[in-house]
């Protein structure tokens, strides 16, 4: 049974419109734009962005705070772990109804394959509002070289799979035309008409390779509206990639010309150059919807944008550029003397959007601070304010690490807390944990590392190794114990806090040896994903080792999921 909860999704003073009643194929208010967030599906396809089920659940709960209409939490048939994560989100997040009746649609992604569709339905059917999102390529290059099927065969598959999805009991079905912007127009109109007749309630127009200009996408939406049989009875959606840096502009133009569902990701993460950014699209609509976009609006609670962005950044390991619009470190920082003078006289001189609208706090650039005298309740409250829903034992675990840090640093900032939670979020699921570490390095001879790891079964294992530097020797020692061939794809260090007692965040990205970096494919061939790890410590080497273990444990859990599938 759905549970009644009170969420902030309807409490922002900016939300003057009521959310229209949810009907799969119709929006009672023609000015309302649905937001489908695919951070947990397409966003996770970014190399190194693989997330655990717990991390996905945390982000899904944060998306509810935002008031996202549809959450696409994954591709259930990709692996057993993906299936379980989507099912858990459907059960827990997909039944949390707020006081205004809002509950997100939980949408499982699947190819136009019966097994995929059945698996996706088994994962999402527990939600109050389940949806199936099935997709097939419609462009000549994809049909010829990837699918190796004729137009007639693709149309038949699309028709049959939408009907099959309907037969399972799902009444909310999205059909996606992959690479729609490079598809033959007449063929696109035809296949969309066929799936609408078969029972699709939303049709998704994908600019899969991010190749079109805004005017071209707008013209495509208008042409689809004018030439597709039955199009008035469904919702038109867009899914824009950012290969030319036009994803946000294309998405806004799609909405202006008739799309009433927009697929986006937090921070714009996704395949290759990423997807349209939720924060950019939503704030563009909020800022210009009344004046330039004929009154278009969403029900996104923008005050939760920043904390959601930071959570996704930490869990995915995808660091933001400082100049990233709205959520980058420099987005509301004014360094020029002329700009500072203008800001002192009137903030509107250089800010058209108030940073408070998206959750920034001007009181300090690094957030509210806690110290060594702070208790667990103060810590719990601050973690809740930052968007983290931790169990009692998880808070206790973070608390003792927080106290240890506070003894050394005197003050612990929001950034410190987020780094701690980011590590703890996965640490509980670890197969291997760091016991002890000793490293000898310098200008004479090779570096030597001695590592003790603790296995999930309680056994301890010790190994020594030499290498070129502390990191190399330590990783080699770990590999002697774990015996899992890996390749280090990326390694970076970042000082995430201010002051003398610097807390260093290490981020690593690994894959299995001889692996491709692509994390997703529509083919039957399994492409091993890449895995990122992030950890924060005051000791650079310890931080680096813990980050590597986080990534390594994710890889091992991923292998386990295939054995269980």
UniProtKB/Swiss-Prot annotation:
GO cellular component: chloroplast
Cofactor(s) the record lists: a divalent metal cation
One of the GO biological process terms: L-leucine biosynthetic process
Keywords: Amino-acid biosynthesis, Branched-chain amino acid biosynthesis, Leucine biosynthesis, Metal-binding, Nitrogen fixation, Nodulation, Transferase
Residue numbers binding a divalent metal cation: 42, 239, 241, 275
EC number from the UniProt entry: 2.3.3.13
Domain of life assignment: Eukaryota
Chain segments carrying region Disordered: 1-21
Induction of synthesis: At the same time as leghemoglobin; after completion of nodule organogenesis and just before the onset of nitrogen-fixation activity.
GO molecular function: 2-isopropylmalate synthase activity; metal ion binding
Enzyme class: transferase
Gene3D superfamilies linked to this entry: 1.10.238.260, 3.30.160.270, Aldolase class I
Biased composition (Low complexity): 1-15
Record domain Pyruvate carboxyltransferase: where: 33-306
CDD domains linked to this entry: DRE_TIM_IPMS (cd07940)
Catalytic activity: 3-methyl-2-oxobutanoate + acetyl-CoA + H2O = (2S)-2-isopropylmalate + CoA + H(+)
Reported tissue expression: Exclusively expressed in mature nodules.
Family note: Belongs to the alpha-IPM synthase/homocitrate synthase family. LeuA type 1 subfamily.
The protein's role, per its UniProt record: Catalyzes the condensation of the acetyl group of acetyl-CoA with 3-methyl-2-oxobutanoate (2-oxoisovalerate) to form 3-carboxy-3-hydroxy-4-methylpentanoate (2-isopropylmalate). May play an important role in symbiotic nitrogen fixation.
NCBIfam families: PRK00915.1-3
Subunit structure, as described in the record: Homodimer.
Name of the protein this chain belongs to: Probable 2-isopropylmalate synthase
Organism: Glycine max
Lineage: Eukaryota, Viridiplantae, Streptophyta, Embryophyta, Tracheophyta
The encoding gene: GMN56
């Amino acid at each position: 049974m759905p549970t009644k909860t009170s969420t902030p999704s309807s409490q922002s003073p900016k939300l003057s419109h009521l959310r229209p009643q949810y009907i799969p194929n119709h929006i009672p208010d023609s000015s309302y734009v649905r937001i489908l967030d695919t951070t947990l599906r397409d966003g996770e396809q970014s190399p190194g962005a693989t997330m655990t089920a717990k991390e996905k659940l945390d982000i899904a709960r944060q998306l509810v705070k935002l008031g996202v209409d549809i959450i696409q939490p994954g591709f259930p048939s990709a692996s057993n772990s993906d299936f379980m994560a989507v099912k858990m989100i459907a059960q827990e997040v997909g039944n949390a109804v707020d006081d205004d009746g809002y509950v997100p649609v939980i949408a499982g992604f699947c190819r136009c394959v019966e097994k995929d569709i059945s698996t996706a339905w088994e994962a999402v059917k527990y939600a109050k509002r389940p949806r199936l999102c099935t997709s097939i390529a419609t462009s000549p290059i994809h049909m010829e070289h990837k699918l190796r099927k004729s137009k007639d065969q693709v149309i038949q598959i699309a028709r049959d799979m939408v009907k099959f999805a309907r037969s399972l009991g799902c009444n909310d079905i999205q059909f996606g035309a992959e690479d729609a912007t490079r598809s033959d127009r007449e063929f696109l109109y035809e296949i969309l008409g066929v799936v609408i007749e078969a029972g699709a309630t939303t049709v998704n127009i994908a600019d899969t390779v991010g190749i079109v200009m805004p005017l071209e996408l707008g013209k495509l939406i208008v042409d689809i509206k004018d030439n597709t049989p039955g199009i008035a009875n469904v919702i038109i959606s867009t899914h824009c990639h950012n290969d030319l840096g036009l994803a946000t502009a294309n998405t806004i133009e799609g909405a202006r010309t008739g799309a009433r569902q927009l697929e986006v990701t937090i921070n714009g993460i996704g395949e290759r150059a990423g997807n349209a950014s939720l924060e950019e699209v939503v704030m563009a609509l909020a800022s210009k919807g009344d004046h330039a976009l004929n009154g278009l609006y969403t029900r996104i609670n923008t005050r939760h944008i920043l904390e959601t962005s930071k959570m996704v950044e930490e869990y995915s390991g995808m660091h933001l550029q400082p100049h990233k619009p709205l959520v980058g470190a420099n987005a509301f920082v004014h360094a020029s003397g002329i700009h500072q003078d203008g800001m002192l006289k009137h903030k509107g001189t250089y800010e058209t959007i108030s940073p408070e609208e998206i959750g920034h706090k001007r009181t300090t650039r690094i957030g509210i601070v806690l110290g060594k005298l702070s208790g667990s309740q103060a810590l719990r409250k601050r973690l809740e304010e930052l968007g983290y829903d931790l169990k009692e034992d998880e808070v206790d675990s973070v608390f003792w690490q927080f106290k240890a840090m506070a003894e050394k640093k005197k003050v612990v900032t929001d950034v410190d807390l987020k780094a701690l939670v980011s590590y703890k979020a996965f640490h509980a699921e670890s197969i291997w944990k760091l016991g002890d570490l000793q490293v000898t390095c310098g200008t004479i001879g090779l570096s030597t590392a001695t590592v003790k790891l603790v296995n999930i079964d309680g056994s301890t294992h010790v190994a020594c190794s030499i290498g070129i530097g502390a990191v190399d020797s330590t990783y080699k020692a770990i590999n002697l114990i774990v015996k899992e061939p890996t390749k280090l794809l990326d390694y970076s260090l970042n000082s995430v806090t201010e002051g003398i007692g610097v807390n260093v965040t290490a981020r690593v990205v690994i894959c299995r040896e001889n692996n491709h970096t692509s994390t997703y494919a529509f083919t039957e061939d399994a492409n091993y994903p890449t895995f990122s790890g992030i950890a924060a410590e005051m000791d650079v080497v310890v931080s680096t080792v813990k980050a590597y273990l986080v990534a390594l444990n994710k890889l091992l859990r991923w292998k386990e999921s295939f054995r269980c599938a």
